Regions:
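Hydrophobic alpha-helical transmembrane segments in integral membrane proteins
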Residues: 18-22
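Substrate-binding cleft of extracellular glycoside hydrolase catalytic domains
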Residues: 26-30, 36-42, 58-142, 148-150
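Hydrophobic faces of well-ordered beta-strands that scaffold small-molecule active sites
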Residues: 32-36, 53-57, 82-88, 116-118, ...
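Hydrophobic membrane-insertion alpha-helices, especially the h-region
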Residues: 1-16
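Functionally critical loop-and-helix segments that line ligand-binding/catalytic clefts
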Residues: 23, 28-33, 41, 172-230
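Catalytic domains of cell-wall/extracellular-matrix polysaccharide-remodeling enzymes
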Residues: 117-188
Length: 230
């Protein structure tokens, strides 16, 4: 019994110590935000804006998928003091033109004021050992260039370190990056954002909402410059 209490006590102490450490590290980043999709449920954006400066809303994936809550989330976010960005998830298996058409049809002019996020991750046979990846890289570059030209906005690439190094940087060496599954710490340019918890939980009105937690990798002044790329 005594041993059990000691183990439980140490566990609680360890958790609280880690929480304090994490909060201290987060305090070094002045700009905080979240990523959301239809799995996040109904969010109060006014409440969200009290502790966050930006929100990225999932819009499309590939050439056919649209997030069910995109329009509703985008519309309601406009009434809050929070900067808004939109997300397209890159598909290796569909053409650039089809993906661009689907994105255009889904979002219209609802692209927010932040750089558009293009999320990239390996799946199935699409990885560094695939001989077709050079062509896939050109497809990604075509999509990024078209988005920048069409919407006159910046584009930030969201991917983990492996995908950024092997796939993204060879074709887009100067593109703004969003480190997926990252850790709070120092990242050199062009990493602009750091996702430190992809499976976060946000408590609102007694409900637990699924979101991704991210910080901007820079100062308030740098954030102002980044957030005005339109």
């Amino acid at each position: 019994m005594v041993l059990t209490l000691v183990v439980v006590g140490l566990g609680i102490w360890g958790w609280r110590t880690w929480q304090s450490y994490q909060q201290a590290r987060l305090a070094r980043y002045p700009i905080h935000g979240v990523t959301i999709n239809q799995d996040s449920g109904y969010l109060d954006f006014q409440q969200l804006a009290k502790n966050n400066q930006f929100v990225y809303i999932q819009a499309t994936s590939g050439a056919t998928y649209s997030d069910n809550d995109f329009s509703n989330n985008y519309s309601r976010a406009q009434g809050a003091e929070i900067k808004v960005g939109v997300v397209h998830t890159f598909s290796f298996s569909t053409s650039a033109s089809r993906q661009l058409h689907h994105f255009n049809q889904t979002v219209g002019r609802q692209t927010g004021t932040l750089p558009i996020m293009v999320a990239v991750s390996y799946y199935d046979q699409y990885n560094s050992s695939n001989q077709d990846m050079a062509a896939q890289g050109q497809k990604l570059k075509k999509i990024v260039t078209a988005l920048e030209t069409t919407y006159q906005q910046g584009v930030v690439i969201y991917a983990n370190k492996t995908v950024l190094t092997q796939f993204v940087r060879p074709v887009l060496p100067n593109q703004d990056e969003w480190m997926a599954d990252g850790h709070l710490g120092h990242y050199d340019s062009p990493v602009q954002l750091i996702e430190y918890n992809a499976s976060g939980k946000l408590s609102q009105n007694g409900q637990s909402q699924a979101v991704g937690f991210t910080v901007f990798n820079g100062t308030q002044r740098q954030w102002t410059k980044f957030s005005q790329q339109n």
